[in-house]
Amino acid sequence: MELNVFAGQEKSELSMIEVARAILEERGRDNEMYFNDLVNEIQNYLEKSNSEIRAALPTFYSDLNVDGSFIPLGENKWGLRSWYAIDEIDEEVITLEEDDEDAPKRKKKRVNAFMDGDDDAIDYGHDDPEDEDNYPGSVSSEYDDENPDDEKDEVESYDSEINEIIPDDELDEEDVDLGEDDDEYSDEEVVDE
């Protein structure tokens, strides 16, 4: 096989990519080539041994992918990008844009205007359950819907057990001695004995 493009040049100075481009240009648009066939034609033209081609094969394949003048056509077929109009090229990039439309939208983070970018400040606003308006009614309506009597019975039994220990009517606040550590303690109430 002779390539007219390289007439007068030494074959040892040619790169595999240059030869691949020349082979595909000479064959024409409707004659895409499988990668193996392309490598065999390059080997025959450059008159290289199998070991030389195998050593250069990873670099050649990388160059084929990186070089903008080649295009993979699927099923390991290759062609020249110049053969195809931009509208004809249906690459993975187009399908990725379609996938982004189905992706869930990220929620915007709420910003507290009073935090002023203080990194050490603790924001208690978002973790307080009382701030949420998710409570449908009073506290008594929060019992389990399946067995509301179970939780009510537990609360009532707990209250009755506490009343058995110290009934409410026996509690006198006057009998309770306050220590110095108590909040209601004051120096005026202490009587020296």
From Swiss-Prot:
GO terms for biological process: DNA-templated transcription; regulation of DNA-templated transcription. It comes from Streptococcus suis (strain 05ZYH33). InterPro entries: Asxl_HARE-HTH, RNAP_delta_N_dom_sf, RpoE. Keywords: DNA-directed RNA polymerase, Nucleotidyltransferase, Transcription, Transferase. Belongs to the RpoE family. The lineage of its organism: Bacteria, Bacillati, Bacillota, Bacilli, Lactobacillales. This is Probable DNA-directed RNA polymerase subunit delta. The gene is rpoE. RNAP is composed of a core of 2 alpha, a beta and a beta' subunits. The core is associated with a delta subunit and one of several sigma factors. The keyword Nucleotidyltransferase applies.
